[in-house]
Amino acid sequence: MSHDVLDRLRSLLGPASVSRDPDGVPRAVPDSTDAVAATLRLVDESGWRVRLEGHGSWVPPDASADLALTTRGLDRIVTVHPADLVATVEAGVPMDVLRRRLADDRMWLALDPPGRPERTVGSIVATATAGALRGGFGPVRDHVLGCTAVTGDGRVIRPGGTVVKNVAGYDLTKLQVGGFGAFGVLTTLHLRLRALPAADVTLLARAPRDHLTSVARDLADAGVQPQALELLSPAVSAESEWIMAARCMGSAGGVAGDLARILDTADLAWNELDVERAHAFWHLVTHAGSGAAMTVRLGVLAAGLDELLDLVGQHLDEGLIWAGASQGGMRWAGDAAPEHLRTLRHLAAEREVPLTLERAPWAVRRAVGHFGAYREGVGPLVAQLREVFDPTSRFVVALGGVEP
């Protein structure tokens, strides 16, 4: 049976587009939306289950599947419209490649996602992973105008487009953002761009954690909002103390004004980085957790950071911690047993803080789930959505987890 399916895949995609991964799992590399759809129709007909991949840095290779479907063949930057500040790209385009192309037109995608530079744009959107710039430019969903996706049974859906539209009913584009591939394979994305800032300045300050969070509240109360205000644990910054990093971006005059307000308001000894050191620092911050066994994000408001930081310290190892000091949000990277993650999720839920398991070995993902337990009434809705977009459960994605 498996040889017959592989032969049909080779006939469909070409021999060079079907191989095996290091563990012997068949891997398909379709190069168009139509090819992805045809692959999934064949897989659905054959009863196979599918593991979705970009460049393979986010999905665990031990996820049990009959086929690994990678978007690496979807690597074209389709259109870039500087006048409209919009780009259309395929999901397999690496983020560093997109950055270089947009810079040619003095534009950028205002995202600094964690992970390796070659992470695909599709994986960033599917996991909704954002870095420090989320505080100033918004989460991943704010940068995605529309998309093309393919369902588990091979149907092509195209919600949204290259302009912002107000549409009654459910926002299908936002459903795909952060859905971890449970609702379809992203193949094409329409992205909102920005002009490159004329000035980009980073300030660093070192102090005890409680003092830094207090200063962040002072800045917020004073209406000072840099594009990033990130609280970093010693393990992230390779320092002996916690660090607060403030990043101001925009016109030269606007940045100068923001810097002056920060220095006037914040009771800290700030150190301004030159361009080269700032680039190296943010590269370190973005990629510090790439080798961690698992990463977790918590949707905490800035006012609740101190309490959540204490909870994380009590129930997980010290790990690496990134926290949005002005707008909230926290990420942790390290290693933890499933029962410790469940305990933290339960305690966070009591405080109205969602916990998302971003990355982990498959056994942990399956036990804990990306989202875990839902509020009353939400679980059945998610199950119904999965039935719509993956009616025969072809995608290997653990959203809810399995209780012990």
Predicted regions located by residue number:
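Short, surface-exposed ligand-recognition loops at beta-strand->loop->(often short) alpha-helix junctions
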Residues: M1, L204-L212, A252-G253, R297-E307, ...
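A conserved active-site cap/scaffold subdomain adjacent to cofactor or substrate pockets
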Residues: V215-E272
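FAD-binding subdomain of flavoenzyme oxidoreductases
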Residues: L111-D112, R116-Q225
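N-terminal accessory segments
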Residues: M1-P26, L42-S57, L344-A367, F371-E376
